[in-house]
């Protein structure tokens, strides 16, 4: 991200208010329309989804949380984890 002048990468763990088929489908539909979210995974554990977000700076990310993710009715809570350094990044599976 730094090389592309994109600031930094954030992994945002999202917990929905309630989880059922309709709410999950609506959430994923909304997320697919948000360009700042470059990856989205349905996960197990304390949270329901893991989002990968690119942000140019902290103020931008704060506004994104308040004005974009914060407007999603089904969103219950979130936790942001900021990437300090990318240690390894590969595509594909080596057999």
Question: How should each PLM-predicted stretch be described?
Answer:
Residues 1-95:
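A compositional/biophysical signature of low hydrophobicity enriched in polar/charged and small residues
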């Amino acid at each position: 991200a730094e090389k592309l002048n994109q600031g930094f990468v954030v992994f945002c763990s999202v917990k929905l208010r309630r989880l059922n088929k309709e709410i999950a489908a609506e959430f994923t539909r909304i997320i697919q329309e948000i360009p700042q979210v470059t990856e989205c995974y349905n996960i197990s554990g304390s949270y329901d989804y893991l989002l990968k977000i690119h942000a140019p700076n902290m103020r931008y990310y704060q506004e994104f949380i308040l004005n974009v993710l914060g407007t999603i009715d089904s969103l219950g809570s979130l936790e942001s984890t900021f990437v300090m350094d990318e240690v390894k990044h590969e595509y594909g599976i080596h057999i």
